């Protein structure tokens, strides 16, 4: 009787975890909802929503580190200028080394054909 109760408890916890996990909303979906509501706000009343839209643009278009788009552009210009200076000094090398650039991280990657390749197909 006791193993049956433990098994039932295990199944109920697993089911509750799966339901909770399925209800989580991915970040991309939240951003698309924010953009669609922003578009609806522009159509309804552009004067009231312009301030919040500018704030949302700064948040969604930044580099992820809290930089505003203007700061990100300045950083890119600085990196490009450093690369041009380095390539101008090393005239014959044909390659310049970039030492700093904004980096965006990918949350997950789908890998196709991730098998080891040692297995022969079943015939």
Curated annotation (Swiss-Prot):
Q: Locations of Basic and acidic residues compositional bias?
A: 38-60, 74-84
- Leader sequence segment: 1-16
Q: Which residues are glycosylated?
A: 63, 65, 87, 93, 114
UniProt keyword annotations, A-Z? Glycoprotein, Proteoglycan, Signal
Which residue ranges does the record annotate as region Disordered? Answer: 32-123
Key word Phosphoprotein present: no
Q: Does the keyword rRNA-binding apply?
A: no
Q: What is the official name of this protein in its record?
A: Chondroitin proteoglycan 8
């Amino acid at each position: 009787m006791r193993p049956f109760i433990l098994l039932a408890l295990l199944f109920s916890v697993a089911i509750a975890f799966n339901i909770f996990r399925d209800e989580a909303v991915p970040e991309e979906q939240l951003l698309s909802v924010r953009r669609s509501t922003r578009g609806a706000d522009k159509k309804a009343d552009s004067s009231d929503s312009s301030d919040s839209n500018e704030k949302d643009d700064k948040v969604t278009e930044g580099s992820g580190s809290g930089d505003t788009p203007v700061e990100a552009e300045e950083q890119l210009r600085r990196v490009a200028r450093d690369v041009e200076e380095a390539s101008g000094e090393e005239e014959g090398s044909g390659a310049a080394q970039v030492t700093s650039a904004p980096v965006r991280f990918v949350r997950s990657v789908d890998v196709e054909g991730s098998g080891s390749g040692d297995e022969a197909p079943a015939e």
